[in-house]
Design a protein with these regions (language model features):
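Conserved catalytic or regulatory cores that recognize and/or transform ribose-phosphate-containing ligands
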Residues: 1-137
Length: 137
């Protein structure tokens, strides 16, 4: 994305990590989190999405992420373009995608084969690139 001349800024939620001093240093992924951490993390994500012109999602087909699906829906509800970059570590399996994502996104760039296209994709106009070769659920 940094090499793409049509990209001015990238918001990556993991660069906006929140810490709650009351939690201590050993909080791990999937552990119960404080209300402060949950509220601040959620609001930072919503703020980033609200200020974005479009969204690009690296979408792990092997371990689906409800948060990504929510964020994609949030952007589409605001009529903002969404580019999904699906990838898998199991290329031998027939890929399947949920209908609401496969028809809701503006463009698909297959992460396993087309990742280099992110360098030249026109994010100013976000041309449509329909998903092909996937089953639908």
């Amino acid at each position: 994305m940094a090499a793409n001349p049509t990209v001015e800024h990238v918001h990556f939620p993991f660069d906006q990590q929140v810490t709650d001093p009351a939690e201590g240093p050993n909080v791990g992924f999937g552990d119960e989190r404080s209300l402060l951490w949950k509220q601040q993390t959620y609001q930072n994500d919503i703020n980033g999405l609200s200020m974005a012109n479009c969204g690009v999602f690296l979408y792990d087909m092997d371990e689906l992420d409800d948060g990504c699906a929510f964020e994609i829906g949030f952007l589409r509800a605001q009529n903002k373009p969404v580019i999904i970059v699906p990838f898998t570590n199991q290329p031998e399996k027939k890929p399947i995608m949920n209908l609401m994502l496969s028809e809701g996104a503006t463009a698909f760039i297959k992460g396993d084969q087309e990742l280099e296209l992110l360098k030249t994709y026109d994010f100013n106009n976000c041309p449509c690139r329909p998903l092909t070769g996937y089953g639908t659920i």
